[in-house]
Design a protein with these regions (language model features):
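Short, charged recognition helix plus adjacent turn
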Residues: 2, 10-11, 62-72
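Residues in the helix-turn-helix
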Residues: 21, 32, 46, 60
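Short basic helix-loop element that most often maps to the first helix and adjoining turn
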Residues: 6-25
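Recognition helix of helix-turn-helix/homeodomain-like DNA-binding domains
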Residues: 28-42
Length: 72
């Protein structure tokens, strides 16, 4: 399974928030923020904190992509 957080980064741009600011607001460790930047899977409670912080749903910040799309 592969995921992408491009939707999350777009929300941050639209709201003029940095990735670092999101990490601080949502209480996310720098290591986990690195996983997000690398489009790696993170624990559901982390995604829940992001959703609560930004007042969005899971589908607004993450999308599932087929492995063929990632490798292309």
């Amino acid at each position: 399974m592969a995921v992408q957080y491009n939707k999350l980064w777009k929300i941050l741009i639209d709201r003029k928030l940095s990735k670092g600011e999101l990490g601080k607001l949502a209480g996310i460790s720098p290591n986990t923020m690195t996983k997000l930047r690398r489009d790696e899977i993170v624990a559901l409670p982390i995604l829940d904190r992001i959703c609560e912080t930004l007042d969005v749903d899971y589908g607004d910040i993450i999308e599932h992509v087929k492995k063929e799309q990632v490798q292309a």
